């Protein structure tokens, strides 16, 4: 089961816990999608990505080739989503997202540690 929308606004932080909300896109998926989506949607830089991956993959090794494919897929997915919504609604937030994702697609990140 994957959340499929791990954006900053879907995390609630309390003094002792972190909660995920907004499960409208949740469903069966490869967990690498959630990992890649978290990196992509939160625009993690290289060091933040390395820190996140080291914390996540404590019992197994990260498949970097698979992660790279999912990172590109997430950028393409959210670029397409933002393009459609910007065209339909004309809200600047969607234009900002599509520009960010376009730049990520144009200059893909390489993850290795």
Feature annotation, model-predicted:
Residues 32-62, 73-89:
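Active-site activation/catalytic loop segments of kinase-like enzymes and analogous catalytic loops
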Residues 81-113:
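ATP/Mg2+ or Mg2+-diphosphate-binding catalytic cores
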Residues 1-33:
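Active-site acidic catalytic loop and adjacent metal/ATP-binding pocket
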Residues 1, 66-69:
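ATP-dependent phospho-/nucleotidyl transfer catalytic cores
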Residues 48-51, 66, 93, 97:
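Exposed alpha-helical structural elements
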Residues 23, 40, 67:
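Conserved short-loop catalytic and cofactor-binding motifs
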